[in-house]
């Protein structure tokens, strides 16, 4: 395995955060990200950037963090005893965008790197990440575009990579208590160290950059589409599922909250408004019903 270059990964992640914020500000036209730089007591820190009340983006956050320490928390080494007694570094960019317009899907992306080192031993390292789309009023052409970008960026790394990481995404973003996917998926990967460091890093970069290629054209197509109170109410109802997933299943959220992470940055992914309604059912044959029948179960899009 080629030796990991931690500084190179960090430089890319900082640049990626800048690039994503710049592109989303452009797409919004009015809103600006406000930065909150923070430090972690045990070592490290980050840059949390949040946009609120933009023209297209109701609320969105793009977070960079880089934390390190002399030993992993017990909760992290319980199922990975080989990490015990090693100093560690973890860094990543994660983002969630909640648009105003119900015809523009919510999107999420994350790329991260982890390394644990011990004097006289080989470092243990891996990459993780992915991106996924959560439409409220889906258009097949948008979902196909999202998955086409996903497939194309995976192609140079092997024919089997897109099907593997697409399927992992479908399994991961699944609400068991609702028996539905969170959205229409995309890519998800973790523990990636199957190739030399340079190749794994190149894949993580492709995913990070691919997010904008996948999302920006959908924003442009849908952001001016007229909507009314009915669509807004449904958007808020479906956002409730986003909250349920993040608080019940999301590994990053749970790990962060359980290990004394920065709560404001961890909960940045929450929508600004959401609603619940007892035993709500969509009207048969309605656009809302179409989401349930055609989009909230894993399927092949290409």
Swiss-Prot record:
It catalyses: coproporphyrinogen III + O2 + 2 H(+) = protoporphyrinogen IX + 2 CO2 + 2 H2O. Its main location: cytoplasm. A divalent metal cation binds at residues 98, 108, 147, 177. It comes from the Bacteria. SUPFAM superfamilies: Coproporphyrinogen III oxidase (SSF102886). Residues 242-277 are annotated as: Important for dimerization. The record marks 177 as: Important for dimerization. Its cofactor is a divalent metal cation. Homodimer. This is Oxygen-dependent coproporphyrinogen-III oxidase.
